[in-house]
Structure formats: C-alpha cells, structure tokens
Amino acid sequence: MGSIRNLLITGSNGFVGQSFLNYLEKLEERELPKKIILVNRSESKPISYKIRSRTEIISLTADLTKEWKFDTESSHILNLAGDGSKNAYTEEAAQNFIKICENLEIWALSHKPKVIVHASSGACFYGDSNNKNFINKSNLILSRIKGEKILARLNIELGTRVVTARLFTFIGPNILNKLHYAATIFIRDSMRSNLINVTGNPNTIRSYMHESTMSDWLANCLLNEKIEGIFSVGSSNPVTIRELAEFISLKTNAKIVFGNTKIEPSTYLPNNESNYKTLGLSEGPKWQDSVTECISIYSKRGMNLD
C-alpha cells in the first residue's frame, strides 16, 4: 500500500470500510498510502491514532447520490458506498446505488485515477430470473450489475484498471454491529435468551471469510495489476446455516429451534480456486475460529451493540 500516493475511500463508515481501516492500522508506516481521503454521507467515524499519526487523513462529507463536487487528487479509489442495511433490497436503495456509480464515472473522467476497486455483491451470480433467490433480491442484484457495467467503461475510456469486487459473506468484530445477518443474530440471541431461532431453511449454504482476510484481498485488488474485471471476494468453504447454528449452540449452550424447512435453500458461495493458485491468496482463519472470536467479543461488549 506504500506505493499508493492518494487513496480515496467512499463509504468508509460501513462494515467493509471499518474493516479495511482496521487492516491499515496493522501495517507499518512505510506500507501505508501517502494520503487517505475518506468520503461519507455523515461525519466520518474517528480514525485511530495509529493511522492518523503516520499518514495524512482528509475526511469529507458528501451525498454521493448527487454531483461529486469535492476536488481532490486520487490515484486509487476504493468505492464502498452503498446501502448495506436491511433496506438494501428496496427500489430506492437500488436507484441510489446506480446514481453513485454514475457520479463516480463522471468524477473519474475528469480526475483520471489509475485504479478503481468497486465493491459489488456476490449475489450478482444469480442469473436465472425464475430463481426465487434472484426474484427476492432483484432490486439489489440488477442495480449492482448495472453499476458494474457503468464503471467498467472507465477501463476503455481512460485505461483505468477497474476491479469489480463481488463481496460474499464475512465474519469478524465489525459484523457484530450488523443485526440483520444470521451469524450476528445467532450470537446475540444465544447470549441474551439462550435460544437460537433458525427461521429459514437450515440447509442454506453460506461461507464466512474473516473481515481481515477480506481487507487483505481488497488491498491486493488495489495493488496487483493482474487483478482486473470481476473478482470474487469470499471463502469457498461451504457452511450450512445448520452448521453455523449448531457450532454457536455448542459454544454458548443455547437451544436451537428450527423453523420452516420448506423454504427453498440457497447457495451463496464463490469459486476462488484460481485466486489461491495464481495470486497466492489465503482464505485466512477457519470460520469456527472467527465465530469463536465474535462470541468472545460479544460476551464482553454485547449489551452495547444494539
């Protein structure tokens, strides 16, 4: 990262942004970008002294769905702006995401960054419109696909290296603030009520890459010239919701109640074998170790997470 002159991060207040900043905090001073510009809709969350004492930090407030009027030189962009809440599947959130991508394209045409890493969704692999998982998430998926196409044009127009990072599911300390994800819900409920309520099909398949590994992969996307176009970020190690619930139950002694198994199960899993072989990337810690870490953290500060 030390070769990056100016790194612009949009949406740094979100889960991915906070995880990435935690990742930067662990780097040596020589490994940090020379300057980091943070752009958020609201005031940027506080930056640790370990980062701000070793590199220049600029924090800007802007509504990225409107014209980008901030004029700052940026050699590299990590675009994380988007609604990561439970409202992300609404039509309004979808249209706002497209506007952000359109505004980024316009801004990039005049500022000419060398590299853009754009956070999209792993759900974009749903291509069959008859698939219920596609239909239920169609607002999000179609907006992400359109955003990918908009920003891909910059490779042709400017020669900018554009990486579309399709993000899957993750685990780690920062995800504990997201109370609409299964892992967080299970951990919270097991600690508070000694009960894990599995409302969906327990055979649904997810994977759980640690947030620090996710951040390392995003850093590779920014730096490695071999990475271009669509790039899946996530673990290829399958974990059923049943396995997740049973492991958390084992660690917390919580009872499990399984709901409607007639709900169609879904598989949300990347195939990253080529990433390991050609790029030397690692999947990081075992998901069980990451979940255990989160249980430990929640037990210490869980009452303050809602």
Map each language-model feature to its residues:
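N-terminal Rossmann NAD(P)H-binding glycine-rich loop of SDR-like oxidoreductase domains
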Residues: 2-30
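Conserved Rossmann-fold NAD(P)-dependent oxidoreductase catalytic core, especially the SDR/UDP-sugar
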Residues: 102-139
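A conserved pocket-lining segment of Rossmann-fold NAD(P)-dependent short-chain dehydrogenase/reductase
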Residues: 162, 167-170, 185-209
